[in-house]
């Protein structure tokens, strides 16, 4: 095609005056790759008849290359605005950290630290000692250990306590926790032999006792936090399982999952057990997450009897799943807030969002609406409507949190157009579409998000 003759050669483009600033700003190999990519895209558009002569001029080509370089060199992991109303959104990074944790992270990240150095003795120390004390203080457990996530915590515990031996678990608790990641798979990987008992909806103490053999090493309870079985149901409580285990000299382990340290039943009207309840029930080993209801960084926390955690601390697998210094700093900073429950509810974003009342959210939504309306063109229309938020993170799946939503419409744009545009902004804004309307939930929009939200909404104006 004649139009293809207008596409400049790579060498010619590299010699253009307009490219000098890009060559000064980026490594030459990166610029060359962007030039080739841009010219190839231009060729494809020309073949589809989607371009004109001006696109081949120096100004147009250089502009395309500059945009390509900006995209290529932008950080892939970036901040965004969570307007979905899902508080512990796994795909959006789960729990945002408390502001007070920022200083702790800065100090540890940009300098040396006593990660594995005992300042009192002047010799090598343990990275796990920095948080073990406060975890035991908050939960009432004898000992604690932290790894990089809860799946790793379960894997380490099972590998240490039950490799090559039987682990008995209720059939109704063989959960999948997301991403096709299933408890039976973790058990097999640990070397433990899965022995399921009971029915999907009903399991009794006699089901466990009838399955115990000389090869049984552990009784396992898994908290079903991401689904609910209702109707004709029965389950064995942690206390009942502990009594059964002691009668057979078997340890009991519980995967609590969401890691709740605050009594939420009075605040949210739900029944989500706390880690402390499992400790008081006498459960020997308990595992839970750091970045769900606890509101901290991704981590797996193991608490329980000292005699059972001691071999985990010396297990070869611990090295593979150990926690890093930044996560330790963030976790310690978050846990310290729990020493004052009122402060924790106020300063830990996850807890603050979850416990915000409908009246508070109505006031927040109205104030945010006024602020947005003052800053965006009239072609972008905003309105309020009642709705519900979700907890997310595989916790409290049946709980609906009343909220006030902000509906967004724009002239000439469908809800899908709005979603795509906002998602493509420098600071992406993620909302949800319901019944053909794009919605933002103020519950999960942080104060610092508002300038970026305004800038994103301004791009909808036409």
Curated annotation (Swiss-Prot):
This is L-seryl-tRNA(Sec) selenium transferase. One of its GO terms (molecular function) is L-seryl-tRNA(Sec) selenium transferase activity. It comes from Geotalea uraniireducens (strain Rf4). Keywords: Cytoplasm, Protein biosynthesis, Pyridoxal phosphate, Selenium, Transferase. The modification N6-(pyridoxal phosphate)lysine is found at residue 292. The gene is selA. The keyword tRNA-binding does not apply. Belongs to the SelA family. SUPFAM superfamilies: PLP-dependent transferases. It catalyses: L-seryl-tRNA(Sec) + selenophosphate + H(+) = L-selenocysteinyl-tRNA(Sec) + phosphate. Coiled coil: none annotated.
């Amino acid at each position: 095609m004649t139009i293809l003759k207008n596409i400049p050669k790579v060498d010619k483009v590299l010699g253009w005056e307009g490219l000098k600033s890009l060559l000064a700003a980026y490594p030459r190999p990166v610029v060359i790759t962007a030039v080739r990519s841009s010219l190839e895209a231009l060729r494809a558009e020309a073949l589809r008849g989607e371009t004109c002569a001006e696109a081949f001029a120096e100004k147009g080509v250089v502009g395309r290359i500059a945009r390509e370089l900006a995209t290529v060199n932008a950080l892939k992991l970036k901040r965004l605005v969570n307007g979905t109303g899902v508080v512990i959104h796994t795909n959006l990074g789960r729990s945002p950290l408390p502001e007070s944790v920022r200083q702790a992270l800065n100090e540890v990240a940009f300098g040396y630290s006593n990660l594995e150095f005992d300042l009192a003795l002047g010799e090598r120390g343990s990275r796990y000692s920095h948080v073990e004390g406060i975890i035991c203080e908050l939960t009432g457990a004898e000992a604690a250990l932290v790894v990089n996530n809860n799946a790793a915590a379960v894997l380490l515990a099972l590998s240490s306590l039950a490799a090559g031996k039987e682990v008995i678990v209720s059939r109704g608790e063989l959960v999948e926790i997301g991403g096709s990641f299933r408890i039976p798979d973790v058990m097999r990987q640990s070397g433990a032999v899965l022995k399921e008992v009971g029915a999907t909806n009903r399991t009794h103490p006699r089901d466990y006792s009838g399955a115990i053999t000389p090869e049984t090493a552990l009784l396992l309870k898994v908290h079903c936090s991401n689904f609910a079985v209702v109707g004709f149901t029965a389950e064995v409580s942690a206390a009942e399982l502990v009594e059964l285990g002691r009668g057979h000299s078997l340890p009991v382990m519980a995967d609590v999952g969401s890691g709740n340290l605050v009594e939420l039943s009075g605040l949210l009207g739900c029944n989500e057990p706390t880690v402390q309840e499992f400790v008081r029930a006498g459960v020997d080993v308990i595992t839970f997450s750091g970045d769900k209801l606890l509101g901290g960084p991704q981590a797996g926390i193991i608490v329980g009897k000292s005699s059972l955690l001691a071999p985990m601390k010396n297990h070869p697998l611990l090295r593979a799943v150990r926690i890093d210094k930044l996560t330790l700093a963030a976790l310690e900073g978050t846990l310290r807030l729990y020493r004052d429950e009122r402060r924790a509810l106020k300063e830990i974003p996850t807890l603050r969002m979850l416990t915000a009342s409908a009246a508070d959210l109505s006031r927040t939504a109205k104030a945010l609406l006024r602020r947005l309306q003052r800053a965006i063109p009239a072609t972008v229309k905003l309105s309020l409507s009642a709705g519900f938020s979700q907890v997310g993170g595989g916790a409290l799946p049946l709980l609906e949190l009343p909220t006030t939503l902000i509906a967004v419409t724009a002239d000439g744009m469908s809800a899908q157009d709005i979603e795509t545009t906002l998602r493509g902004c420098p600071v992406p804004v993620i909302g949800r579409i319901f019944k053909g309307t794009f919605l933002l939930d103020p519950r999960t929009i942080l104060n610092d998000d508002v300038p970026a939200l305004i800038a994103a909404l301004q791009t909808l104006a036409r």
